[in-house]
């Protein structure tokens, strides 16, 4: 009995002496990963991470039985079958640590350690311990896993363990999961203490939210059982770096759970959330190697996306350390104790007796602290205890004191405050002592602010304080009045604060400036413009234009000329026509009445025949005969016309016969009061010319017959209001044959634009001709047939016009046909060839439009040249072209202007060109073109334009037969309105140019055309037959233009174009015999869609820098060509030579160029389908680059230099490559074309300087080869084309003339055979350009269009059949 009592006493003494220590674990030496399960990557949740920790036990501080605990946050479990580890040194166990895995129960794992008897007071042991662990990165929707899912992120992390109040840590890099976070997420891990697995599945991501879905998993066999009592369902708003939910919220769903299946259905999950489920599952004893889970993932997203992604995944088996607990249930309980720490323990369990294993989580009683306050002098602390399961409360009551304040006045200079604390009571006393107050003085004064304010200035005790009231200055009312004195004066009346001051300005009367100008009315008027003080009043006297008297007189020269003598207002202008002394006959009949005058004139006809025989061996004869019959129009004007034909000598003889017949009827009425003219005109004419040329010699004979005929039928009606125009035209014609003629006409009434202009240039018949028809001006057609084909035309036009308002509905048609017969032989045995050429052309243009416009032409005065040209064209098939023009004056202070206009097929467009030149200091010109309806400038006057044209060409023989049968039908209605555009120029140089316009154009146009062209050519090497037909329709619904500072934007809503083509080509050469080609007609239309394009220009000037930038991009898709097959060879050689000479300073391409010009052009790659001359299908890719370099200046006049480099590459491809973009080269066929040009132009000129222009040769070569195309059964034997071109231009510029000589030689050869089938549509990306100048000019452009066409199945079938047939 005594022994038992002693043992109990020893036990209780030992318990009483044991204590809790800390700081045993001293360092975190390392944390490394070892892949122990063939995991895809080393994630923190995968086994095994090995932590190496340093420990130390000091016998003087620790005793056997003492305890210490290591807490490891975010550690999920220990990867070992051991339950504890010993801290051993030299084979001695100094402490034993037991593992407590957190798993799904706590957010941390821990080790509870007990010091063993091996430690004595004279021992200090230390060492390291290795712990195999895995971390918890989440995996279910429980609060423990949700909290631990936020412990770490991918990348560098700090892992910290705690031993009491001592912390040890290390850094580690955790890699991110490679699995996609947007797809189905599935996860499972073993819970060793429960001998179960937790299984998780997250639905695939729907960014816009889920409309509905089904999610779950099931067992494929009986190898696994689902614990339906542990299921969890939620939605999460995010996944961490390892695809684990970081939150869990409830939502509406329906669940179905059985031991073999766990499925939920859900609806209306908001965007940003994803459904997920988890549950415990238990592996059966038979599933030793693993088990399968079948995942269900069906979802319908809010944005219409749908998915059904089933998955079967095999999970390998995992064996835990509690293998002997088969059939026993595990219960997790929580017990609250009065200890201060949380612990996990497993109650004793005997599997042979007990049926339940109990894991007990021991938690301390929670405590909350409440702090209160009260009026008192001491602090109190009270504790409200609680039983286990409750919460204890600690109340801390903190005292505070109240205060009472006593204020008194004293003799000191400062304020003092003293606080007296009462140790026995809760009321303290504050004593405040303030000095006695000073007297105050108030003053009022003005200040610069806008509101009144008050400022107080205090001084020390026994002093005087000041109050300053600051008022804002009074408002001022200023009045200005005239007075009788000659000088200005100002009087100011001021008032006190809060009043109003007055300023009276007295000005003398303004001076007056009187100007006199012409106007369109028939009477004189005076207008007075007054301005305010210090201005200048204006008196404008407007006088009608002077009457003009025209006289004609003969003179001794052989050419005609016109002289105009103008006088000031109220005078009479004179026009003197000087004619050479020639034979003429005319008859004039005049009938007059009270209201109209009619006249008729019969022009005489004459013929001249001349023959000339030279002393050379070759004899040539010239016979010339012509007759004309031109009835004069019946119009309210007396007219006289004459025609003279003179003989001339020629180096080669020729015979020309021509007859001209025309009739012209005109009806018009005039009302002077309303200034309205209306007319209805009909004009028809026919011309037939026959010319024969022959030249006989001892060895060859050649005869040529040319027949040309045309007929014109036009109708138009005009309404003209407020017209006052005068035109004076003089023309001089000279040629090498020494024939000279002149024509002069003066007409006080000029008809308005008819908007249908028919013009033709028959330069092949007339070697040199100028045709400029216009309803606004007299028509002049000059032509000469000369064996040397050289002519000179000089004309002078003076124009003065006011506003025009017209409405017209013209209709016109034009028919022409021509034929050419030629027989030639060079020797009695040479070959003979016949050529027959005929053509016909008909045009019907029916536009209707309404136009209001006004224009004024400015004065040419010293230093500045300002010219404006206005024209309007409303015909789809019309073309208006004018040659280069230049103005010249004898006055040294007046400089020149060059201008060139070429307008073709414009619809509803008003165009004008404004040129400003400053020539006295070499600043160059600023040229701009813009749509406009009116131009106003500071000064207006007549403009004289002189044009000269010199052309030299060598006619070449041609052997061809061409038939052209076009038919064009168009209709158009449009209306336009626009504001005025103003141009402002100031100072002695062009400092600023302000351009502003707003225009709106609406139209409803439609145009259709039907064109048929066939051509036959016979030559010694073969014959070519070609034919084509074209049908097109176009419509433009609406177009709007808005412009500010020369900024333009326009849009075309729709454009449709359809075409058909039929081309048959046969080529026979001496080098290779070819077979006849057959081309299949493709009737499917092309569709083009245009997107809006924009154009903007911005001007800014600092008198030295001009910059311009142009960017453009367009996209066009074109249809493939039809299938063709050819075997061909082509050889071409041509030589061209031209010479041009322009008068002084009339060089249109150089004069208006700014100083120091730099232009950069870059063309991106392009691809398109097109037919070669051999009718093969070729898809090409091209890129070009041209870079003109900055010019260099050698004097203060003008210097211009340009360098250009170009490169082009073409790629040929088959039908499988239906889209080609920039920098792509198509396969399987290759085609290469290179164009290189490096011309350099340098021009420098002043009063006496000259410059030479040299350009290197330009060479272009094309080399194409076509291989076999895949998937289309194409055959190809290769196609090679070579084109070479060389240019050796030479230009010489003098101060008085510019001469340019151009020589060009072209050699081309094509040979080979090919067969190609239909290719698919491609995309063309065309040209991006950037330019910069050394003066202020910026231009941008952007646009795009696309087209798509697919070949018909019929064409594909026919092409395959044709391929096998050939």
Curated annotation (Swiss-Prot):
Prodomain positions: 1346-1366
Chain intervals with Polar residues compositional bias: 959-969, 1022-1040, 1085-1107, 1192-1202, 1209-1218
Keyword entries, A-Z: Cell adhesion, Cell membrane, Cell wall, Disulfide bond, Glycoprotein, GPI-anchor, Lipoprotein, Membrane, Repeat, Secreted, Signal, Virulence
Post-translational note: The GPI-anchor is attached to the protein in the endoplasmic reticulum and serves to target the protein to the cell surface. There, the glucosamine-inositol phospholipid moiety is cleaved off and the GPI-modified mannoprotein is covalently attached via its lipidless GPI glycan remnant to the 1,6-beta-glucan of the outer cell wall layer.
The keyword Cell membrane is assigned to this record: yes
Pfam families named in the record: Candida_ALS (PF05792), Candida_ALS_N (PF11766)
Effect on the protein upon substituting residue 1310 to M: In allele ALS6-2
Record annotation: effect of changing residue 1238 to S: In allele ALS6-2
Similarity field: Belongs to the ALS family.
Protein name, UniProt field: Agglutinin-like protein 6
Native species: Candida albicans (strain SC5314 / ATCC MYA-2876)
């Amino acid at each position: 009995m005594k022994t038992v009592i002693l043992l109990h006493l020893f036990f209780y003494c030992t318990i009483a002496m044991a204590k809790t220590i800390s700081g045993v674990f001293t360092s975190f030496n390392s944390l490394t990963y070892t892949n122990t399960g063939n995991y895809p990557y080393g994630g923190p949740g995968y086994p095994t991470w090995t932590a190496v920790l340093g420990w130390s036990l000091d016998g003087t501080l620790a005793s056997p039985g003492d305890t210490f605990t290591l807490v490891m946050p975010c550690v999920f479990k220990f990867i070992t079958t051991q339950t504890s580890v010993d801290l051993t040194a030299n084979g001695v166990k100094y402490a034993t640590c037991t593992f407590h895995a957190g798993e799904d129960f706590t957010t941390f794992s821990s080790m509870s350690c007990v010091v063993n008897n091996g430690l004595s007071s004279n021992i200090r042991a230390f060492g390291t311990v290795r712990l195999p662990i895995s971390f918890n990165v989440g995996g279910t929707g429980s609060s423990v896993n949700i909290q631990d899912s936020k412990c770490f992120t991918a990348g560098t992390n700090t892992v910290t363990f705690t031993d009491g109040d001592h912390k040890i840590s290390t850094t580690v890099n955790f890699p991110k999961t490679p699995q996609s976070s947007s797809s189905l997420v599935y996860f499972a891990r073993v819970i060793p203490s429960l001998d179960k697995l937790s299984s998780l599945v997250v639905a695939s991501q729907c960014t816009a939210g889920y409309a509905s879905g089904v999610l779950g998993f099931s067992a494929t066999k009986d190898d696994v059982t689902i614990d339906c009592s542990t299921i969890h369902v939620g939605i999460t708003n995010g996944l961490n770096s390892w695809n684990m939910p970081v939150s869990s919220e409830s939502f509406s769903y329906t669940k179905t759970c059985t031991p073999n299946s766990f499925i939920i259905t859900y609806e209306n999950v908001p965007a940003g959330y994803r459904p997920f489920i988890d549950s415990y599952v238990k592996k059966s004893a038979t599933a030793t190697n693993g088990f399968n889970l079948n995942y269900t993932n069906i979802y319908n997203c809010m944005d219409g996306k749908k998915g059904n992604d089933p998955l079967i995944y095999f999970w390998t088996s995992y064996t835990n350390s509690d293998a002997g607990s088969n059939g026993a249930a595990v219960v997790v309980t929580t017990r609250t104790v009065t200890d201060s720490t949380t612990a996990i323990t497993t109650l004793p369990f005997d599997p042979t007796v007990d049926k339940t294993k109990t894991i007990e989580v021991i938690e301390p009683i929670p405590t909350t602290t409440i702090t209160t306050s009260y009026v008192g002098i001491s602090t109190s602390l009270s504790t409200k205890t609680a039983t286990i399961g409750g919460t204890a409360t600690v109340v801390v009551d903190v005292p505070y004191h109240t205060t009472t304040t006593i204020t008194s006045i004293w003799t000191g200079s400062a304020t003092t405050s003293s606080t007296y604390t009462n140790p026995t009571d809760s009321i303290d006393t504050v004593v405040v002592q303030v000095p006695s107050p000073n007297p105050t003085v108030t003053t009022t004064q003005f200040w610069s602010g806008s509101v009144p304010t008050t400022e107080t200035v205090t001084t020390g005790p026994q002093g005087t304080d000041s109050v300053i009231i600051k008022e804002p200055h009074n408002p001022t009312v200023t009045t200005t009045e005239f007075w009788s004195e000659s000088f200005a004066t100002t009087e100011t009346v001021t008032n006190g604060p809060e009043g109003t001051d007055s300023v009276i300005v007295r000005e003398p009367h303004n001076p007056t400036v009187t100007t006199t100008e012409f106007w369109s009315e028939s009477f004189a008027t005076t207008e007075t413009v007054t301005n305010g003080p210090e201005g200048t009043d204006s008196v404008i006297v407007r006088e009608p234009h002077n009457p003009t008297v025209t006289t004609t007189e003969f003179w001794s020269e052989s050419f005609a000329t016109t002289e105009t003598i103008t006088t000031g207002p109220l005078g009479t202008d004179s026009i003197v026509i000087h004619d050479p002394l020639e034979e003429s006959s005319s008859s004039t009949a005049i009938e007059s009445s009270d209201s109209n005058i009619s006249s008729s004139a019969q022009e005489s006809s004459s013929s001249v025949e001349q023959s000339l025989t030279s002393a050379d061996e070759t004899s040539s004869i010239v016979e010339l005969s012509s007759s004309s019959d031109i009835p004069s129009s019946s119009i309210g004007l007396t007219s006289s016309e004459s025609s003279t034909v003179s003989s001339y000598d020629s180096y080669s003889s020729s015979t020309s016969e021509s007859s001209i017949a025309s009739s012209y009827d005109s009806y018009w009425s005039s009302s002077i009061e309303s200034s309205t003219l209306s007319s209805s005109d009909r004009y028809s004419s026919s011309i037939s010319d026959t010319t024969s040329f022959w030249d006989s010699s001892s060895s060859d004979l050649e005869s040529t017959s040319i027949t040309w005929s045309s007929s014109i039928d036009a109708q138009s009606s005009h309404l003209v209001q407020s017209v006052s125009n005068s035109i004076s035209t003089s023309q001089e014609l000279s040629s090498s044959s020494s024939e000279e003629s002149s024509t002069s006409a003066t007409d006080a009434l000029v008809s308005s634009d008819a908007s249908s202009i028919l013009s033709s240039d028959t330069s092949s018949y007339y070697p040199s001709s100028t045709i400029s028809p216009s309803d606004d001006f007299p028509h002049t057609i000059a032509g000469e047939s000369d064996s040397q084909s050289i002519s000179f035309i000089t004309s002078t036009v003076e124009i003065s016009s006011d506003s025009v308002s017209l409405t017209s509905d013209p209709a016109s048609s034009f028919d022409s046909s021509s034929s050419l017969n030629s027989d030639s032989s060079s020797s009695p045995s040479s070959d003979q060839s016949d050529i027959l050429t005929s053509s016909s052309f008909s045009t019907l243009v029916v536009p209707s439009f309404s136009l209001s416009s006004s224009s004024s032409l400015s004065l040419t005065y010293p230093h500045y040249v300002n010219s404006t040209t206005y024209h309007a064209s409303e015909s789809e098939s019309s073309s208006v072209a004018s040659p280069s023009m230049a103005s010249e004056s004898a006055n040294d202070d007046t400089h020149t202007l060059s201008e060139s206009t070429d307008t073709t097929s414009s619809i509803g467009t008003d165009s004008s060109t404004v040129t400003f030149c400053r020539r006295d200091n070499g600043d160059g010109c600023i040229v701009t073109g813009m749509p406009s309806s009116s131009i106003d400038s500071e000064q207006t006057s007549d403009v004289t334009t002189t044009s000269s044209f010199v052309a030299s060409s060598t006619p070449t023989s041609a052997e061809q037969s061409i038939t052209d049968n076009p038919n064009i039908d168009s209709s158009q209605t449009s209306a336009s309105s626009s504001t005025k555009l103003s141009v402002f120029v100031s100072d002695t140089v062009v400092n600023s140019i302000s351009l502003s316009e707003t225009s709106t154009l609406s139209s409803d146009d439609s145009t259709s055309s039907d064109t048929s062209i066939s051509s036959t050519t016979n030559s010694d090497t073969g014959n070519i037959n070609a034919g084509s037909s074209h049908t097109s329709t176009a419509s433009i619904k609406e177009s709007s233009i808005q412009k500010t500072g020369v900024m333009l934007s326009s849009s075309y809503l729709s454009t449709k174009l359809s075409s058909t083509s039929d081309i048959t080509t046969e080529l026979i050469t001496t080098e290779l015999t070819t077979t006849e080609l057959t081309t299949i007609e493709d009737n499917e239309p092309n569709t083009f869609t245009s997107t809006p394009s924009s154009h903007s220009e911005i001007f800014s000037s600092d008198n030295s820098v001009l910059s311009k930038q142009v960017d453009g991009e367009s996209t066009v898709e074109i249809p493939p060509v039809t299938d063709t097959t050819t075997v061909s060879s082509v050889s071409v050689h041509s030589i061209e030579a031209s010479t041009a000479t322009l008068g002084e300073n009339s060089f249109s391409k150089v004069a208006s160029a700014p100083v120091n010009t730099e232009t950069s052009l870059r063309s991106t790659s392009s691809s398109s389908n097109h037919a070669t001359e051999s009718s093969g299908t070729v898809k090409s890719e091209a890129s070009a680059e041209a870079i003109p370099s900055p010019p260099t200046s050698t004097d203060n006049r003008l210097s211009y230099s340009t360098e250009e480099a170009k490169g082009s590459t073409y790629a040929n491809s088959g039908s499988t490559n239906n889209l080609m973009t920039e920098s792509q080269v198509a396969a399987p066929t290759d085609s290469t074309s290179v164009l290189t040009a490096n011309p350099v132009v340098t021009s420098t000129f002043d009063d006496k300087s000259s410059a030479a222009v040299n350009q290197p040769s330009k060479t272009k070569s094309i080399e194409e080869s076509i291989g076999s195309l895949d998937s289309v059964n194409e055959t190809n034997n290769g196609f090679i084309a070579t084109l070479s071109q060389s240019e050796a231009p030479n230009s010489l510029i003098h101060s008085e003339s510019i001469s340019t000589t151009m020589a060009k030689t072209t050699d081309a050869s094509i040979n080979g055979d090919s067969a190609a089938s239909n290719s698919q549509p491609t995309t063309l990306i065309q040209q991006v350009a950037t330019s910069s100048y050394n003066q202020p000019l910026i231009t941008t452009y952007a646009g795009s269009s696309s087209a798509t066409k697919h070949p018909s199945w019929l064409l594909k079938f026919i092409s395959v059949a044709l391929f096998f047939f050939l």
